[in-house]
Every structure is written in structure tokens, then in C-alpha cells.
Amino acid sequence: MSLVHTTIQLSEVVEVHPSLIPVINRFGIRLGLGDRTVKDICLEHNLDEDFFLTVINTFLNEGYFPEKKLQTFHTSLIVDYLTKTNAYYSRSQLPNIERHLSSFISMSSENNPSLALIGKFFNSFKDELLNRIEQDEKNWFPHCLELNNKLKECAELVQIGRAHV
């Protein structure tokens, strides 16, 4: 398993793995990378290098999931990335799939029960996914951020308490 590191040119990685383009877009990185390294691009976009590399390497390597490292990242970093991922699927991918599927179904012979079933399955899946995304945005993400803030407050109180001992 070959991992991306800070000294590699990001354009080389994208050339080999074009499916990475939507992932780097979520970090505000657009094509036209030139010969800049991952480190250069992270500095330019004010990105946490470790978080960026962890996301990229997790995406590219099925067996790579650094659970301990993920636990070290600030909750807001993770929530921001997941929010952008949700937006990508709800605003781009789902409408694109729906448009192509609808076109395919409308161009096919009438009374095809298999296509009708596929259409129903997709609509059901889309509704479930959009509902999950809505729950993330309204409940789960705010809860995670609030919990993180409370933990931070507790840690600050512990520090204050130690200072007075």
C-alpha cells in the first residue's frame, strides 16, 4: 500500500487517481495544481496537512483507516469535511444519477417492469440518503460540535482548578 505524503506533487496523485478530484474539491482545491507538492497546496489553502493526508490516503487505500489518528483531529475539521461531502452527494451526485437514470428509463421500451423497479429502488434510496444527510446537518453534527465544546470547557475548568491547587 503506497501512501501519499507531503513531498509528492498532488498533480501526480490526481493523474493516477482522477476519482480523487471531488475529494480535493471539498478542501477548496481546484485543478491546475502544477508541480506543487501536497505541503505547498496545504499551506496555500490553509489546510491541516495531517487531516488532508489522512482523508486522501483513506480514500485511496481500502485497508488504510488510522482510527487513532482520526481521533486526534478537531471535531470541527471532521464535521466541515463531512458537511461538504454531504453537499457533494445531495447537490451533485444524486441529481446526476437521477437525470441519467430517468433518461435511460424514458428511452427504453415501455412497460419494462425491471426498469420501473430500478427507478423505485433509486427513489427510495435517494429519499433515505437525503433524510440521513438532513439528520446529520440538523442533529448529529451540531450535537458533536456541542459535545466537543463542553469537553473543551471541562478541560479548561480542570486547568483552572489545577492552577489554584
Regions found by a protein language model. Name each.
Residues 1-164:
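Small-residue-biased structural context
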